[in-house]
Amino acid sequence: MSKFSDIITQLLFDAPPREINSVYDSLVIITEDTDNDTLLDALKRCLVAKRLPIDVEGSPTIVTEYNKDGAKYFDPFKKVLFSVDCLDRVGLDIEPHESETTPYQEKLYEELQKYVAKNFPGDSACTVLPTGDDDELAIIIVSSKFSPSNYWSGYWKSEYIYSPEERSLTGRIDVVVHYFEDGNVKFSTQEFIDKEDINDPISCIRALESEIETGLDESFSKLNQTQFAKLRRKLPVTRSKVNWGKAISNYRLGKDAAQGK
């Protein structure tokens, strides 16, 4: 790749996943749209690497190297083949596709769907795909939330390789949280997984991710009480009293509390 392509790719890959399109739009302006093919190619590689879902016939589908077929991608459970519009993140040129799935793969996918629906409240998707290496299956979960009015975005991606024959589960979990109100704070963490003697990979994933989520909650709480506390602006000392009893409704905090916000 050229130096220009390297820089473009790095900027897109470093962006919080739910804000990639905003970064792309800015890059189009900065580069004066002189090399749109390079930008689109980098955007597509970024979407695939981060497993960001594509809307295919009204439901999310994850595109990866495992379900690539020529210039298109297929969903083995929807039985469709499609191309990708990277900007709008939708599937185009959709056509029927007979993808072979095993009963065990379908069983894992059904269990995974139930787990994701119950535990990931954001924009979520999951899949189970053969890796092409013996009996190995890639188990992928991705979920994200974006609240621009509250100046934050969040992203979770967990990806595992499970071998039914060896009963091994390896993988990695990536979590990114971005706060950008009057500042710019990005929290990024990775957890690597390596487990053996696993007969039920979905139950194992459920337990692992619950433990990791608890650890993240504790880390955020500690961070909020230490490093974040140092960043907060200290309020000025006015040496005047606030009549909370009679005038609380005049203050924004009181109004929000009264309205249940």
UniProtKB/Swiss-Prot annotation:
GO terms for biological process: actin cytoskeleton organization; barbed-end actin filament capping. Keywords: Actin capping, Actin-binding. GO terms for molecular function: actin filament binding. GO terms for cellular component: actin cortical patch; cellular bud tip; cortical cytoskeleton; F-actin capping protein complex; incipient cellular bud site; mitotic actomyosin contractile ring. Pfam families: F-actin_cap_A. Transmembrane segments: none annotated. The keyword Nucleotide-binding does not apply. Belongs to the F-actin-capping protein alpha subunit family. F-actin-capping proteins bind in a Ca(2+)-independent manner to the fast growing ends of actin filaments (barbed end) thereby blocking the exchange of subunits at these ends. Unlike other capping proteins (such as gelsolin and severin), these proteins do not sever actin filaments. Heterodimer of an alpha and a beta subunit. This is F-actin-capping protein subunit alpha. The lineage of its organism: Eukaryota, Fungi, Dikarya, Ascomycota, Saccharomycotina.
